[in-house]
Amino acid sequence: MIRKVIFFVAGVFLSASLIVMAQSITTNNEQNTYKQLARFGDIFERVRTQYVTIPDDQKLIENAINGMLLSLDPHSSYMDAEKAKDMRDSTKGEFGGLGIEVTMENNLIKVVSPIDDTPAAKAGVLAGDFISKIDGKQISGQTLNEAVDQMRGPAGTPITLTINRFGVDKPLDIKIVRDIIKVKAVKYRVEGDIGYLRLIQFTEKTFSDLQAAIKDIQSKIPTDKLKGYVLDLRLNPGGLLDQAISVTDAFLNKGEIVSTRGRKQNDVMRFDAKLGDLTDEKPIIVLINGGSASASEIVAGALQDHRRATIIGTQSFGKGSVQTIIPLGENGALRLTTALYYTPSGTSIQGIGITPDIVVEQPLPEKYKGYDVTLGESELRGHIKGKQESDKGSGSAAFVPRDPKDDVQLNEAYKLLRGEITHAAFPPDPNKVF
């Protein structure tokens, strides 16, 4: 009994010692941080007082902030008040510009996806293109926000993008006229006995537009004739998390849709489906490719894990991180990566992507042969390395032909839904566990 007490007391002293040590380490770390900040202040003062020309203090500070955020990952950034407003406008589905989703890679702007029916898409800008110049001026050394700011502008104004395209010997100058970009969140059509749903982007209107599209399809195809739906998420760069959750919920009656996990062990949020499948549990085939990112992967991953849909296409982009927009009042906003998201099976797709149940490659037209249209998170410099990421990486070709007749992936989906061909992965086995 005495020995037990002694051990207990020893444990208390040991714990107390560890607490003192931890406090000491914390204090030392804080002191070191303040020293580094003092060093920054010293350098800042020397630059503003000794540089050959008088610099703009605000630009110096903003660029320092951007440098700090860019050192974290490709998706964290600072936005001044004007850029924060532009970001809010884009999530509403309407803004002035070219209509391309871009990221930064090797000091160049890389096109993730041109949005359908926008000036950039009509002018021939392709996923995977690198923008090296804007109106003849090199953009190397600029931040992503600075380059995007130059590409946006009033409708009717011209802009010339100099494009470096893999497989093309010389840079291409593509002239584009800016327009008001009204992103139609959902496009749909009736294909005989099949409902085709294409989600362009996850904006504030995506779920409501999807509801309306499904309702209209159901009014045009009798229930006993409707074979199912094709949900096309190819070239969809993502968008709002809440819209991805609502869209997924439209096809489920129960179960987890997605979970997000932050830096702390208890920093976990789970989102579950509610009763009510809008498609009356009709068969669903989801199409993905290297241009399917973020919110698109949440939808595809959840429907795949719950065996609600069969996924066709090629490996998706692999962006499994969540960005939180932190308002800074009149000083703009901070776009900061705060969590990773996980599919219902507990899988993080960061740097991996969603693997289709049925891999179907889309052949490139002759003029693009030898051109690399592969997109993937794992290729981005400074990306957060996923726990399950391998040398294989993420992503695949990001190309969809304009003519549905040439769309091999889409036609594969139609044939499966109509029973013209069979595959073990369709329909998915609902009894198969994660």
Curated annotation (Swiss-Prot):
Reading the lineage from the top rank, the first entry is Bacteria
PTM (free text): May undergo autocatalytic processing at the C-terminus (398-434 or 425-434 missing).
Name the chain's protein: Carboxy-terminal-processing protease
Q: Which PROSITE patterns match?
A: PDZ
**Single GO molecular function:** serine-type endopeptidase activity
Q: What is its EC number?
A: 3.4.21.102
- Where does the protein end up? Secreted
Compositionally biased spans, kind Basic and acidic residues? 383-392
Q: Which residues form the active site?
A: S294 (charge relay system), D305 (charge relay system), K319 (charge relay system)
Main location as per UniProt: secreted
Q: Which GO terms describe its biological process?
A: proteolysis; signal transduction
Catalysis performed (reactions): The enzyme shows specific recognition of a C-terminal tripeptide, Xaa-Yaa-Zaa, in which Xaa is preferably Ala or Leu, Yaa is preferably Ala or Tyr, and Zaa is preferably Ala, but then cleaves at a variable distance from the C-terminus. A typical cleavage is -Ala-Ala-|-Arg-Ala-Ala-Lys-Glu-Asn-Tyr-Ala-Leu-Ala-Ala
CDD domains named among the record's database cross-references: cpPDZ_CPP-like (cd06782), Peptidase_S41_CPP (cd07560)
- Hydrolase is among the record's keywords: yes
What's the family? Answer: Belongs to the peptidase S41A family.
PDZ domain spans which residues? 86-166
